[in-house]
């Protein structure tokens, strides 16, 4: 079986071997050391400020999306959400659920966010900006510098879902003044699904500390407090966190986040060159290195999916 899906992706032999091992007890100094190292490397690879923190949630990326919305935003905010597909819609649904005032920038499928579209919302009193930097459902990667400039100009709190693009595309929390970054274990981190990761700036931590959401499992204040001792409030996905540790250390020993991004970019470019003479059209205005969104011109996506799966042992996303 070969995964050519956006996630889960192919894991290394080293990561898979850890999955075969007996899961150890975790309320120990040894596991705390692993978590401290995970936090250090995540902050390094996200290019976060020295006073930023990392939270590891046992749950999918959506769990961390929900945790961020409920812990950093309130009914006193006025939020602007980029909605370019199903994951942008997820943020809309979360703000609706928690009764957080919002407006959405609704984009056509495959279309990138443009500066003139943003300009309509300039100076309109928005306090926070929420975006999936890579809208995985359509394969569109948004211009983070443009978004960052807009948020700086309007003094907006910036939340970025980088679940499918972290490590695949350039990302710089400090340079782009990002307050919250979210990612997941099963995308370019190339580990099994089950853990999502939140990187919080000092400004975001301040919001978390002032907020009192009605939740237990996704309470980031509790998660940050426990993280000070290298632990989590509740039983975490111990095995996956050990796999993440091995993967992060491997990225560091191979030259760091820049080398990893270059490698993934080269793979994306090679595939796109090879596919261009086949009967497909690319439906994204601006692609991430993580995904090549193709529309088949001579067959159904589901038929291609089934043929690759059943006859070749290759998995792709049929949607």
Feature map (PLM): residue ranges:
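Active-site C-terminal subdomain of aminotransferase-like
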Residues: 10-11, 186-269
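Conserved beta-loop-alpha segment that forms the PLP phosphate-binding cup at the N-terminus of a helix
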Residues: 51-84, 88-91
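Conserved active-site segment immediately N-terminal to the catalytic lysine
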Residues: 174-186
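Conserved C-terminal alpha-helix-loop-beta "cap" of PLP-dependent enzymes
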Residues: 90, 276-319
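Hydrophobic beta-strand scaffold residues
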Residues: 102, 158-159, 282, 316
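Active-site phosphate-binding strand-loop segment of PLP-dependent enzymes
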Residues: 112-167
């Amino acid at each position: 079986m070969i995964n050519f899906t956006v996630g889960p992706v192919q894991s290394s032999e080293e990561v898979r071997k850890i999955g075969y091992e007996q899961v150890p007890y975790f309320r120990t100094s040894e596991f705390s050391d692993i978590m401290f190292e995970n936090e250090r490397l995540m902050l390094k690879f996200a290019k976060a400020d020295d006073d930023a923190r990392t939270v590891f949630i046992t749950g999918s990326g959506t769990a961390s999306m929900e945790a961020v919305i409920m812990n950093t935003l309130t009914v006193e905010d006025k939020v602007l959400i980029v909605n370019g597909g199903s994951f942008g819609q997820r943020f809309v649904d979360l703000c609706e659920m928690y009764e957080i005032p919002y407006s959405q920038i609704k984009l056509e499928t495959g279309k990138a966010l443009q500066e003139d579209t943003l300009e309509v919302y300039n100076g309109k009193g928005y306090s926070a900006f929420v975006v999936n930097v890579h809208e995985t459902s359509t394969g569109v990667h948004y211009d983070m510098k443009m978004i960052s400039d807009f948020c700086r100009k309007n003094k907006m709190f910036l939340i970025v879902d980088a679940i499918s693009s972290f490590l695949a595309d350039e990302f710089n929390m400090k340079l782009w003044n990002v307050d919250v970054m979210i990612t997941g274990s099963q995308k370019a981190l190339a580990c099994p699904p089950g853990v999502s990761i939140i990187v919080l700036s000092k400004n975001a931590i301040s919001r978390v500390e002032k907020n009192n959401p009605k939740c237990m499992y996704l309470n980031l204040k509790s998660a940050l407090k426990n993280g000070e001792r290298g632990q989590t409030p509740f039983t975490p996905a111990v095995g996956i966190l050990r796999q993440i540790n091995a993967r992060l250390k491997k990225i560091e020993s191979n030259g760091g986040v820049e080398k990893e991004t270059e490698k993934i970019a080269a793979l994306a470019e090679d595939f796109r060159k090879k596919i261009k003479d086949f009967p497909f059209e690319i439906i994204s205005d601006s692609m991430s290195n993580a995904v090549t969104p193709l529309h088949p011109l001579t067959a159904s996506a589901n038929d291609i999916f089934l043929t690759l799966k059943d006859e070749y042992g290759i998995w792709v996303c049929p949607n």
